Structure formats: structure tokens, C-alpha cells
């Protein structure tokens, strides 16, 4: 049985979710999977590498060889203390969070598995042998929840979701349907008050979040950039009509056939990623188009989004298993 070690900072948010999804996908494909969740702390930075070196030495002395695993999968960051613990080392990077300090370790890697097609040339340009595996998201669909002709924006704690422009635009359109925004207190500058805006700043139970996701026909996800885009993909999974930026990698997931695209007005950069920003006029155009779309067409778009979600989930699980097997052979 092929032994795989998943390595990432267990932050309780996106990386923890990725660890869980990868663990389930690889376990279902008959791999022996270990999760090495890394915690923050100055003491950990000293003690953890020392423990790994001691364990590696003990394996050598016992005649078992230094490599406990066949493949290390490192999420987002290169973890050099683990390089000697596996026969093959792989990075699953996010362009927008790539740390330049990791460049010196790239020659030690056997492969990069990237989550979007947009990321392939980015990491090939760094000299990495790069393979598109894609990714998946949790299936949040609950067909028992009645759907409302309303809009939802899951801002969370991210500063890359285009939330401020969204709220400002909605305030100028009191005749638009209700917009519900969920945002972390760490990210919210203020709580917006308007007759057709419900701005919830704080944390809610996951069951309530799932209900809200399923209850809204429209999900607004105008991200500046995404490593993959769980909140876009979860929205498609519940059969919502999703609006996002007409820019990579967001428009890999959302197309006009299964959602709405917002034209970017300007660009910027964040690490290796290009960031995209929209203006009020572009959002107005996209929202008005959705509001003028028939219910039958909206239902068709939501069904197409759900179909894409299911197809993508199956394809990812097949690709990641095949990629790991080929590398470990």
C-alpha cells in the first residue's frame, strides 16, 4: 500500500479543509494516509524539526531506511524538515500565497500538483515539473431547504472577496432584492445598515451557514483572486447561480452557461497571482442581467452548476489518485 503524508498548517480554516478533503479522497482510493497538521508557535519551530531528525536517525539505525512515507504532499508551503522523510515530495501551491522564501527548496521537489489550470504556467516558470490535478469542495447541498430569490455573499475573514465594492453598490440600489453578507469581525470595517442588506458580522454555526447557502438562489463571489475557490465551488454544489469575476482562475469554474461573469476594471498583483478588481458599473450590469433572467433559465443554470460540481469532484478524485500512484511507482 502506498503511504502518503499530508503536510500543512492546521489553521482551522481553508488549509484544514483541504487536509480533510485530500485525506478522504486518498483514503477512498486505498492509500495509507497520514495527516501532519502543523501548529503555530516559536517553540514548535525549534522542537518539531528536531523530533523529525531524531525519528529519521532512529529509522536509519534500525535498518528501516530514513523514509517513512512514499509521497509527501505539502499544501501551500514547502516544509523542508519533511523532505528527507519520503521518497517523493510534492507541493500543492496557491499562487497568491506563495512565499518567496520557498524558492530555494524548489529543486528538492519532485512535482507540483496545481489546483487550477491557470496555475500550471505560473509554477512551470519556476522550474517545477507541474501537473494539473484540480481540487474539490465539500458537498453542501440540501434540497429540503426552500430557495429564495435573494443574494448571498460569504465574505468570511478574507480581504480578497470584493466585499466593500459589493456593499457600496448595493446601498445605491434599494430596489434590488435582499443581500445577505456574512463576515468575520476580523475583516469587517463596519456593519452596513440598509433596508435590503443583512450584514451579519460574527460567527455562526455550520448548520446555519449550510442552510443559508442552500436558501439563496444567487451567490455573489467577486474574488480578486483564488487558489481554488471553495466558496465558489460550494455555491455551485448547492445549485446556486454564481456571479464572479471574468478572470482566471475564477472563470475556470464559473462560465456564462452556469453563472454570471463580472468584467474586471483593473488589475494588481499578490505574490505570483494577478488580482482583479471590479467597479460598481460592472456589478450593476451583472446583477441586472440576473434579475431579468427567467426562472426557468435560472433553474437551468443552477442545474448546470450542480452537474459541473459533481463532474469536477469525480475527476479530481481520479486525477489525484493517478498522479500519486504514478509518482510513487
Language model: regions and residue ranges:
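N-terminal pre-catalytic "stem/leader" segment of glycosyltransferase-like enzymes
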Residues: 1-75, 314
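Conserved donor-binding/catalytic core segment of Leloir-type glycosyltransferases
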Residues: 142-161, 167-171, 179-180
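A charged, aromatic-enriched C-terminal amphipathic alpha-helix characteristic of glycosyltransferases
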Residues: 140, 282, 291-325
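Donor nucleotide-sugar binding/catalytic pocket of nucleotide-sugar-dependent glycosyltransferases
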Residues: 110-141
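Aromatic "clamp/platform" in nucleotide-sugar-dependent glycosyltransferases that forms part
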Residues: 224
Amino acid at each position: 500500500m502506498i503511504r502518503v503524508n499530508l503536510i500543512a498548517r492546521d489553521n482551522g480554516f481553508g488549509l484544514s479543509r483541504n487536509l480533510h478533503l485530500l485525506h478522504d479522497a486518498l483514503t477512498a482510493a486505498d492509500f495509507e494516509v497520514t495527516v501532519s497538521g502543523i501548529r503555530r508557535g516559536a517553540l514548535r519551530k525549534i522542537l518539531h524539526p528536531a523530533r523529525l531528525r531524531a525519528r529519521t536517525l532512529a529509522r536509519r539505525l534500525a535498518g528501516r531506511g530514513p523514509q517513512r512515507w512514499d509521497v509527501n504532499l505539502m499544501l501551500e508551503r514547502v516544509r523542508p524538515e519533511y523532505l528527507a522523510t519520503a521518497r517523493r515530495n510534492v507541493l500543492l501551491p496557491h499562487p497568491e500565497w506563495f512565499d518567496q522564501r520557498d524558492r530555494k527548496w524548489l529543486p528538492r521537489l519532485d512535482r507540483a500538483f496545481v489546483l487550477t489550470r491557470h496555475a500550471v504556467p505560473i509554477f512551470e516558470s519556476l522550474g517545477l515539473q507541474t501537473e494539473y490535478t484540480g481540487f474539490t469542495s465539500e458537498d453542501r447541498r440540501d434540497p429540503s431547504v426552500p430557495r429564495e430569490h435573494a443574494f448571498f455573499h460569504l465574505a468570511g475573514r478574507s480581504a480578497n472577496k470584493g466585499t466593500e465594492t459589493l456593499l457600496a453598490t448595493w446601498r445605491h440600489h434599494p430596489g434590488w432584492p435582499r443581500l445577505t453578507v456574512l463576515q468575520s469581525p476580523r475583516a469587517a470595517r463596519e456593519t452596513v445598515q440598509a433596508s435590503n442588506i443583512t450584514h451579519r458580522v460574527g460567527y455562526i454555526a455550520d448548520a446555519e451557514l449550510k442552510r443559508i447557502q442552500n436558501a439563496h438562489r444567487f451567490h455573489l463571489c467577486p474574488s480578486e483572486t483564488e487558489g481554488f475557490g471553495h466558496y465558489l465551488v460550494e455555491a455551485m454544489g448547492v445549485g446556486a447561480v454564481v456571479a464572479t469575476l471574468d478572470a482566471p482562475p475564477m472563470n475556470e469554474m464559473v462560465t456564462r452557461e452556469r453563472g454570471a461573469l463580472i468584467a474586471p476594471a483593473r488589475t494588481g498583483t499578490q505574490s505570483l497571482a494577478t488580482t482583479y478588481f471590479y467597479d460598481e458599473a460592472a456589478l450593476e450590469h451583472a446583477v441586472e442581467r440576473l434579475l431579468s433572467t427567467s426562472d426557468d433559465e435560472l433553474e437551468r443554470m443552477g442545474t448546470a452548476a450542480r452537474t459541473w460540481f459533481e463532474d469536477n469532484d469525480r475527476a479530481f478524485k481520479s486525477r489525484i489518485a493517478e498522479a500519486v500512484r504514478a509518482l510513487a511507482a
